[in-house]
């Protein structure tokens, strides 16, 4: 194996290393996987308008997220059950994110608990939350995240039911017997039963609350002072509702194309959300980020930062903590290079004028009518 030169190469290594059920769980999307492909392809249709002859000898990639200073606008998205990828699981990811000076989001469905992740040492961490039918479970989880020093809640709002992930159905996906969903240990919610289709789909149907609505976003604010990021917004309408309901931020997300197929790529939905937010709250994006150029494009469209998920899991599977560190370093280095070659020395200098989107190309064509 030669030197790894980009983030995508880790996926091929992960595929060789992991059991099929684990790899398919991480890699697959919903139904036809159109959105899964589109999350990547939409980035490739956005082009650069680089500015030249600008002194780029010093480049500052630092930024602030919810008041926390981080080294770069690239953060770790929540991904479930990381010990299926590597025995160190979320511990390794937490250490790599902290070493890179960025934020890690821990999944509700992690195979390490909030307390265990906190024990890895200092670091800025967010907690991704699913709202369970039993609100006492939710309250307990939020309390534990607060006590463990987590700084924000990323509330997933696009999963009243689990998307139809056909690979998981074929594989009859279930959490391996030696692992548990550590945040639910002792609650009878830590294990996943074998099912006729996907064990996770059955688990979600049994535990996650389908009645979840904006009133629950309000309720969460009554039980915690932590800022709440609404994760899973794709439209202007829901952006305005997020603002009206006191969200601290929005994550434009289609759940890694694992929920509703044929929704737009997140990078395609981003500008609509940013415009509707009117600067009243920060807008982040996840889904399909594999290059530093992708990070730049997202920021040019108004994102305050990006979250990466699958690249973290695949690099974790391939090389543990060192793999995750390497992915974060490669993305950082590529992003820095993109800034330099585009003529930007700070994030504030990245503007909409630095890119051309499909809609820009269309509006530039004079109408024949």
Curated annotation (Swiss-Prot):
Q: What is its EC number?
A: 1.1.3.15
Q: Give the superkingdom in one word.
A: Eukaryota
Q: Which Pfam families match?
A: FMN_dh
Ligand binding (glyoxylate): 25, 130, 165, 255, 258
Chief localisation class: other
What GO CC annotations are associated with the protein? peroxisome
Q: In which pathway does it act?
A: Photosynthesis; photorespiration; glycine from 2-phosphoglycolate: step 2/3
Keyword Oxidoreductase among record annotations: yes
Annotated localization:
Peroxisome
Q: For site (Involved in determining the substrate specificity of glycolate oxidase), what residue positions does UniProt give? A: 109
Q: Reaction catalysed?
A: glycolate + O2 = glyoxylate + H2O2
Q: What happens when the gene is disrupted?
A: The mutant shows deficiency in glycolate oxidase activity and is non-viable in air; leaves become necrotic within 7 days and plants die within 15 days. When the mutant cells are shifted from high CO2 to air in light, they accumulate glycolate linearly for 6 hours to levels 7-fold higher than wild type and 11-fold higher after 25 hours.
GO terms in the biological process aspect are: oxidative photosynthetic carbon pathway; response to other organism
Question: What does this protein need as cofactor?
Answer: FMN
Which GO terms label this protein's molecular function in UniProt? (S)-2-hydroxy-acid oxidase activity; FMN binding
Start and end of every FMN hydroxy acid dehydrogenase domain?
Answer: 1-360
Keyword entries, A-Z: Flavoprotein, FMN, Glycolate pathway, Oxidoreductase, Peroxisome, Photorespiration
Residues annotated as catalytic: 255 (proton acceptor)
What function does the entry list?
Catalyzes the oxidation of glycolate to glyoxylate, with a reduction of O2 to H2O2. Is an essential enzyme in photorespiration in plants. Photorespiration plays a vital role in C4 photosynthesis in Z.mays and is essential for maize seedling development and maintaining low (non-toxic) levels of glycolate.
Q: How does it assemble?
A: Homotetramer.
Similarity remark: Belongs to the FMN-dependent alpha-hydroxy acid dehydrogenase family.
**Protein name in UniProt:** Glycolate oxidase 1
Q: Which organism is it from?
A: Zea mays
Q: What is the lineage of its organism?
A: Eukaryota, Viridiplantae, Streptophyta, Embryophyta, Tracheophyta
């Amino acid at each position: 194996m030669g030197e790894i030169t980009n983030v995508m190469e880790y996926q091929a290594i992960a595929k060789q290393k992991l059991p099929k059920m684990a790899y398919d769980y991480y890699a697959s999307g919903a139904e036809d996987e159109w959105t899964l492909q589109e999350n990547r392809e939409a980035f490739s249709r956005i082009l650069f308008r680089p500015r030249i002859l600008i002194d780029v000898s010093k480049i500052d990639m630092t930024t602030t997220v919810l008041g926390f200073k981080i080294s770069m606008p690239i953060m770790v998205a929540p991904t479930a059950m990381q010990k299926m990828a590597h025995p160190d699981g979320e511990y390794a990811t937490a250490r790599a994110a902290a070493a890179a000076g960025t934020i890690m989001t821990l999944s509700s469905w992690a195979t390490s608990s909030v307390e265990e992740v906190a024990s890895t040492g200092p670091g800025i961490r967010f907690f991704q939350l699913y709202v369970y039918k039993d609100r006492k479970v939710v309250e307990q989880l939020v309390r534990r995240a607060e006590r463990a020093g987590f700084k924000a809640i990323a509330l997933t709002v696009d999963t009243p039911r689990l998307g139809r992930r056909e690979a998981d159905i074929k594989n009859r996906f279930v959490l391996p017997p030696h692992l548990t969903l550590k945040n639910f240990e002792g609650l009878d919610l830590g294990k996943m039963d074998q099912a006729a289709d996907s064990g996770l789909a059955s688990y979600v149907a049994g535990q996650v609350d389908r009645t979840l609505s904006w009133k629950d976003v309000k309720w969460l604010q009554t039980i915690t002072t932590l800022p709440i990021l609404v994760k899973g917004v794709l439209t202007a309408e829901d952006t305005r509702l997020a603002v009206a309901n006191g969200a601290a931020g929005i994550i434009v997300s289609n759940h890694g194309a694992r929920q509703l197929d044929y929704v737009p790529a997140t990078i395609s939905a981003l500008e609509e959300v940013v415009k509707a937010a009117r600067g009243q709250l920060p807008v982040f994006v996840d889904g399909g980020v594999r290059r530093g150029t992708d990070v730049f494009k997202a920021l040019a469209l108004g994102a305050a930062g990006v979250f990466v998920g699958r690249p973290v899991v695949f690099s974790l599977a391939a090389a543990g903590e060192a793999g995750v560190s390497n992915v974060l370093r490669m993305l950082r280095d590529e992003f820095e290079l993109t800034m330099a070659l585009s003529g930007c020395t700070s994030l504030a200098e990245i503007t909409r004028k630095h890119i051309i989107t499909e809609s820009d190309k269309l509006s530039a064509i004079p109408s024949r009518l």
